[in-house]
From Swiss-Prot:
GO biological process terms on file: symbiont-mediated suppression of host innate immune response; symbiont-mediated suppression of host JAK-STAT cascade via inhibition of STAT1 activity; symbiont-mediated suppression of host JAK-STAT cascade via inhibition of STAT2 activity; symbiont-mediated suppression of host type I interferon-mediated signaling pathway; viral transcription
Sequence similarity: Belongs to the lyssavirus protein P family.
Protein name, per record: Phosphoprotein
Gene Ontology MF annotations: RNA-directed RNA polymerase activity
Region of interest (Disordered), ranges: 139-195
Organism, scientific name: Lagos bat virus (LBV)
Gene name, Swiss-Prot/TrEMBL: P
Stored SUPFAM superfamilies: Phosphoprotein M1, C-terminal domain (SSF118173)
Lineage: Viruses, Riboviria, Orthornavirae, Negarnaviricota, Haploviricotina
Residue stretches of biased makeup (Basic and acidic residues): 184-193
Length: 305
C-alpha cells in the first residue's frame, strides 16, 4: 500500500510547474500580440510619409531585401565605372599585394638592394592602381591639344636663310641653358642611385640579422643581449641613422660585411632610452670603435690585394 502513495511535496512541485507553464504561455501570447500589433491597426497612408520615404519602395528578392529609389534623375554616370554589387575590388588587390610581397622577399634573398626593390614595387603598385581604379581619359580630350599643336606649327617660307654655326640664333640662345640642366640632372640621378644602392645594401644586411642578438657591456660589469627588434623602429629609420656611422658607407659601397654590432649600438644609443639605461656607454663606444677599425682594415687589405 505504501508503494502506491504520492508524497505531498511532489504534488506541490507539480502544481508549481503547472503555474509556471501557464505564465509562460501567457507571456508568449503577449509577445505575439505585441509583435503583430501593427497588423491590427489601419493601413499607412503613403502621402503622410516624409518626402524621402515616398521615393523608396521595397522589393522582395530571393536572397536579400533591397531598397530601390524611384527617383532616377539623381543617378550619376560616375557610378558606372565601379564594380557591380557582389564584387569586392579589394579581393584582387589583396591578391596582387600578396604576390608582390612574395617577389620582394625572393629578390631580397637573392641579394638585391632594398631601395631598388622598393622603387620597382612602387611602380608596379602605381600601374595596378592606375589601370584598375583610375578612370582613363577620353580620346576627345587627348585629340584637342594634338590638333591645336599641329595647326600652330608655322611652315618655312621661301625666303628662309640658314644661320651660320658661329652665330647662334635667338632660339638657340634662349635654349642654351637647357643642356647644362640635363647634365646636372643626370649627375644628380647618378649620385642618387649610388646612395640608394648603398642604403639598400645596409638595409639588406640589417634585415637579415634583425632578430640576431649581440652582446654589449652592461653597467653591472657584465653583459646583456640586444637586437634590432628591441628598438621598435622601422627599417628605413634604422638605415638612415646607421648612415651616420663613420665608414659604413664605404664598407657598403665595397659590398663588404657591415659591422652590425657597431651599427646596432650606435642606433640604440641614439634612439633607445632602455639601451642607455642598461649599457655602459663608455665601453660600448670603445667596442664600436674597435669594430669599425677592424672592418675598415679588412677592406683596405682587400683593396691592396
Amino acid at each position: 500500500m505504501s508503494k502506491g502513495l504520492i508524497h505531498p511535496s511532489a504534488i506541490r512541485s507539480g502544481l508549481v510547474d503547472l503555474e509556471m507553464a501557464e505564465e509562460t504561455v501567457d507571456l508568449v501570447h503577449k509577445n505575439l500580440a505585441d509583435s503583430q500589433a501593427h497588423l491590427q491597426g489601419e493601413p499607412l497612408n503613403v502621402d503622410s510619409l516624409p518626402e524621402d520615404m515616398r521615393k523608396m519602395r521595397l522589393t522582395n528578392a530571393p536572397s536579400e531585401r533591397e531598397i530601390i529609389e524611384e527617383d532616377e534623375e539623381e543617378y550619376s554616370s560616375e557610378d558606372e565605372y565601379y564594380l557591380s554589387q557582389g564584387q569586392d575590388p579589394m579581393v584582387p588587390f589583396q591578391n596582387f599585394l600578396d604576390e608582390l610581397g612574395t617577389q620582394i622577399v625572393r629578390r631580397m634573398k637573392s641579394g638585391d638592394g632594398f631601395f631598388k626593390i622598393w622603387s620597382a614595387a612602387s611602380e608596379d603598385i602605381k600601374g595596378y592602381v592606375l589601370s584598375t581604379f583610375m578612370k582613363p581619359e577620353t580620346q576627345a580630350t587627348v585629340s584637342k591639344p594634338t590638333q591645336t599643336d599641329s595647326l600652330s606649327v608655322p611652315r618655312p617660307s621661301q625666303g628662309y636663310t640658314s644661320v651660320p654655326r658661329d652665330k647662334p640664333s635667338n632660339s638657340e640662345s634662349q635654349g642654351g641653358g637647357v643642356k647644362p640642366k640635363k647634365v646636372q640632372k643626370s649627375e644628380w640621378t647618378r649620385d642618387t642611385d649610388e646612395i640608394s644602392d648603398i642604403e639598400g645594401e645596409v638595409a639588406h644586411q640589417v634585415a637579415e640579422s634583425f632578430s640576431k642578438k649581440y652582446k654589449f657591456p652592461s653597467r653591472s660589469s657584465g653583459i646583456f643581449l640586444w637586437n634590432f627588434e628591441q628598438l621598435k623602429m622601422n627599417l628605413d629609420d634604422i638605415v638612415k641613422t646607421s648612415m651616420n656611422v663613420p665608414g659604413v658607407d664605404k664598407i657598403a659601397e665595397k659590398g663588404g660585411k657591415l659591422p652590425l654590432r657597431c651599427i646596432l649600438g650606435f642606433v640604440s644609443l641614439d634612439s633607445s632610452k632602455r639601451f642607455r639605461l642598461l649599457a655602459d656607454t663608455d665601453k660600448v663606444a670603445r667596442l664600436m670603435q674597435d669594430d669599425i677599425h677592424n672592418y675598415m682594415t679588412r677592406i683596405e687589405e682587400i683593396d691592396h690585394n
